Amino acid sequence: MDCQNGRRANRTVRFARTAESRYPERYSYEYDPEETLSRAAPSMRNAPTIPPPTASGADEMRYTASRPASPARPWSPTRAADWVRPPSAAASYYERADINGSPRPGTPSSRYGGSPRRPLPPAPLFSKPGTTTQDTKIDIGDGEEDPFGGGGRTISSRHGPQGSVQSFTSESTFIADETDLEKVDLDEYEEESNETKSMVDPNLHYGPAPEKQSRRGVRNAQMAKKEVQLVNGELILECKIPTILHSFLPRRDDREFTHMRYTAVTCDPDDFTQRGYKLRQQIGRTMRETELFICITMYNEDETHFTRTMHGVMQNISHFCSRSKSRTWGKDGWKKIVVCIISDGRKKVHPRTLNALAALGVYQEGIAKNVVNQKQVNAHVYEYTTQVSLDSDLKFKGAEKGIVPCQVIFCLKEHNQKKLNSHRWFFNAFGRALQPNICILLDVGTRPEPTALYHLWKAFDQDSNVAGAAGEIKASKGKNMLGLLNPLVASQNFEYKMSNILDKPLESVFGYITVLPGALSAYRFFALQNDAEGNGPLNQYFKGETLHGKDADVFTANMYLAEDRILCWELVAKREERWVLRFVKSAVGETDVPDSIPEFISQRRRWLNGAFFAAVYSIVNVKQLWKTDHSLARKILLQIESVYQLLQLIFTYFGLANFYLAFFFIAGSLTDEKIDPFGHNMGKYIFIVLRYACVLVMCLQFIFSMGNRPQGAKKLYLSSMIVYSIVMAYTAFCTLYLIVLELMAKTGHDVPITMSDTLFVNIVVSLLSTVGLYFFTSFMYLDPWHMFTSSAQYFALLPSYICTLQCYAFCNTHDVTWGTKGDNTINTDLGTARIINGSIVEVEMPSEQLDIDSGYDAALRNLRDRLEVPDPGVSESQQQEDYYRAVRTYMVSVWMVANVVLAMAVSEVYGVGSSGTNVYLAIILWSVAVLAIIRAIGSTAYAVLYLIQKLVEGKAKFQAGNIASANASAAGSSLGTKSNVSYGSKGLNMTDRINETKWAISRGMQKAMFWKK
């Protein structure tokens, strides 16, 4: 019967088309404006009214008990075939997983204009089994409750009344008989006649092209004007989260899980608390103390970088909650942690990053406003406690993967005002409101290991004098370590490793780490606060944001390119305090490093200039250390560190000359025909060619650096780096060849000529103190694999680090920008054309002929009188730029002349063949050895202290385990039960001892497996 009904309906439609095309005068319809349509009016005029179908025309409407708010549309035959099988009544309510079981973006309900053939999204992997959708139903506010909160009422709708809820019963959907026919576009059918084609108006305009492809089951959000009560004159909204997100949340017992809070902030971050703004952690049932405040700053990074960092933070929060025996943390430890995500510029944020935030429930489109109560909005603050996480593969992770709730604050700044301003929002606005104990700073793209944040927090918990802590930054080597095939990535991997093995431990022993990396660092919030007069670390830290005009001299501007170094110095040198900085090697974070030459040079320009000027600042102000409350021993150590930094600064400044002189004396030793390894005096010719090539590239380097950006001169910089690598390789070959000759002579072999004992000792000591100590300390820290995979690339690019990077940095000291920020000011001095109605605008213009004539007369009078036009002068910004460039020129000239004079003087005093009596070469080699030995001593001291600390902690845990075991045994004896089998007399049962042994073995294997590092 259903098949016959379907064929009859299709024949009816075909008959209607044929009849209408042949007899158009019989088929004229009148439009009834009182008729209620469930959809938008069709583009064709005189649309017919079609009564509802009979029982034979379509199946009766069926409602599903489990989805009362999403009824399915009735099935009806299509025009493409005689008969189509209707959908099965037992069809599943869940479709296949999109990627990993994550919910589809569409709303599969006819209530929202969705497709009737689109089933419901799949059940998430972490949804509770056995629960139905009735348990997760929430009211979306059909006139009863406003989803935006505040009890506002709808004023008007942009789209007018909508009837999509009743679309499945609309009278305009079905055909009752042959007299009530649907008017259709006849161009869609092949059987239409030429007469029918002539009915179509060729000039008919269908409107503009759609901006994007329409998706089945997805409808655009429909906006409506509402009245919302302002809170203290500010806009604060409580918005319901999406229904599909709410449906699979494990916890829905509090408003922080079911509503997202939006606040439009119209003040400066320094006035956030004074203006009465409050966060969720300060109001109502969510009023809590904040122990850990995590800041994630981002600019325009995509969703992959964001989810990598955010998922790592969520894993760390889960680790905090897993420490059930901790006095601070435990099952509800997430309530003491707040994650603050700050995006620098609403126009700069990546759209897919906003999509990732929306998937977590933190962000909703269409809520933010530019102006509130005639005040411009400076930041949009979204607050939500999310219970799901997205990993870097965009797969949802929930409670089944150990993810716990996370309190998130998303601050979307209206304008791009650089990273320093983002930190001002974090510390001065949200930090003052929450008053946290510890603040952790992260950059988007850095993936902290699951226990990294706990180890950072533990450093503050164990020592009350710690004001800041730095984690170990590890370079990302790509999948299967394929990134090491890129020499840039490999050299940076070696540099990061040796810095974490030699430099950071040494500075940690002294108590002053020159820089806490913004990618992974932590601060004690109390230590950062200013004094009563407003002077202190934060005041100095944020001074770089407000430098303008005469105050922004080149030295200060470049110094604040590395403002985190200034903050570290101000903490250690804080008056009448005894704060120290620590390096936490167990807090590891992985970050991406530049893999292209332009990106690499641009990054190091800011690092080198900031580090150089910040080091000068700390050395000049070293006397501030004597006004602190440090012990005498600590003050002496800090003075020694200042001397060490001064030596490093001198070597950095004369790096060009020292590199050239080392090549000149070592490679020049092979110009003697007696020890020429190539014969025919080839050693001399090779030395001459490489010498002039090296000098030529150094000269060209200044032209490249002053006249070209790295992005526009990639091949030039690549060529110079290749030449430097060849020079370095030949110098290394000459060094090894001379050492082999000397060793052969000392063992009795007949060699034509030997080095002097002094030169031999100098070279050997220098090599052993660098390469030898690199191997020794790497094996001491059980992390030697970078010596085999990345050391060759690093030493090959070492001249480029010294020459190319340093030259580009000094030649661009006038560039003190972090990025580009355009001028977004709109000038209104000419007036505006205000739209009145449609294409009619209101403008100001001369209204009478007399006004036009007076303007003409004024022009003629000015020509006759020859009035002098006042000179506008040079703008302040142009004066500042000229000043920066002039100082840059003086600075580069002095630096270049100093290096050239040093190289020429030493090379003239000591010739090529006088290496044995070369005092300057001996000073250079022994200075390198002394500095390397100091670093090795500091690294060894840090390792010893770290080992002692772990032994003390292990002993304390062991004793606590003995006490707990004794108490358990006593309790078991009193109850007449037998306790666990003990292992020896140590108080540990067999199971605990086996578990501890397994853990120790596993930990050792993880450290030994280089492919996981």
Swiss-Prot record:
Looking up InterPro entries in the UniProt record yields:
Chitin_synth (IPR004835), Chitin_synth_fun (IPR004834), Chitin_synth_N (IPR013616), Nucleotide-diphossugar_trans (IPR029044)
What induces or represses expression of this protein, per its UniProt record? Expressed specifically during asexual differentiation but not during either vegetative growth or sexual differentiation. Expression is stimulated by osmostress.
Name its cellular compartments.
Answer: Cell membrane; Cell septum
Q: Which residues cross the membrane?
A: 646-666, 686-706, 721-741, 759-779, 792-811, 892-912, 919-939
- Cellular component, GO, one term: cell periphery
Return the similarity comment: Belongs to the chitin synthase family. Class II subfamily.
Q: What is this protein called?
A: Chitin synthase A
Organism equals Emericella nidulans (strain FGSC A4 / ATCC 38163 / CBS 112.46 / NRRL 194 / M139)
